[in-house]
Amino acid sequence: MFKKPLIFVCMTVIVFLLICGCAAKQEASLPRLIIGCNNYEPYYYADADGEPAGMDVDLAKEACARMGYVPVFRQINWNERDAALESGEVDCLWSCLTMDVLPDDYAWVGPYMRSRQVVAVLEDSPIHTLSDLTGKRVAVRTGSKAEKLFLEMTGENIPQVGKVYSQNQTDEIATALRNGYVDAIAGYAATVRKVLQKENVQYRFIDEELSHAAFGIAFLKDSKTAVRDALSETLSEMLADGTTASILKRYGVDTAKALGGLAGE
């Protein structure tokens, strides 16, 4: 009586296992692209299951799938990223890396998107312009573009702030703002927005921007051009067919600002 259903179930399981086995073998035969990453939400972070997630992760997965590669995300000490590249620990750096900061240090692929450096304050703050930051306390992430801007005053509109507090994690600067330890925080718009919402901080951006940044993927200068060329072509295709915009929109990014003027748009 139960023989036929049992046979059907067994056959279904066998077919499923065969399909999974074939898929695993096929993936195992594909070349790997080992990607060096830095924890910088929402570009790269670990999700609730500890798996890599974020805008850069989603873009890399899509690009690698089209190229016939398997992406391997490896979180590294970002201060030692050059050593990781040179030793072969990673093939490239793909983690909201700004091309204009180190334009000649790497073989670049991109830009694949742009971002804005912004300043956030508490909703009821008297700070409304960059000049209002003069003499104030500003928190930034250690090693970030915002840190460089305030410490070196490398822009015409950068004021002389009273103190720059550098923190290792973005949530630490959000906590500093919420608790009144600093008057403002600065960083990439998507990152600042994400962490302040996550920490439930009532905030606003001041109207003036600190700067714009173009993100790219960094390879060693003597790395294989075939991989770089294939990745560059694939990212252009993703931009042209709307895939990049679709991915960024899932993270609340203003795609008109993030992708406007890039090749393929």
Labelled PLM ranges:
Residues 18-21:
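C-terminal motif of bacterial Sec signal peptides marking the signal peptidase cleavage site
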Residues 23-25:
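Bacterial signal peptide processing site
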Residues 27-97, 166, 230, 250:
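Extracytoplasmic small-molecule ligand-binding "clamshell" domains
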Residues 36-41, 74-79, 88-100, 123, ...:
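Beta->alpha turn/N-cap motifs
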Residues 38-39, 114-121, 197-236, 254-265:
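Periplasmic-binding protein-like
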Residues 46-48, 60-69, 146-167, 196-200, ...:
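Ligand-binding cleft/hinge of the Venus flytrap
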Residues 80-83, 95-105, 149-152, 176-212:
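A ligand-binding cleft/hinge motif common to bilobed small-molecule-binding domains
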Residues 121-138:
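Flexible hinge/capping segments at coil-to-helix
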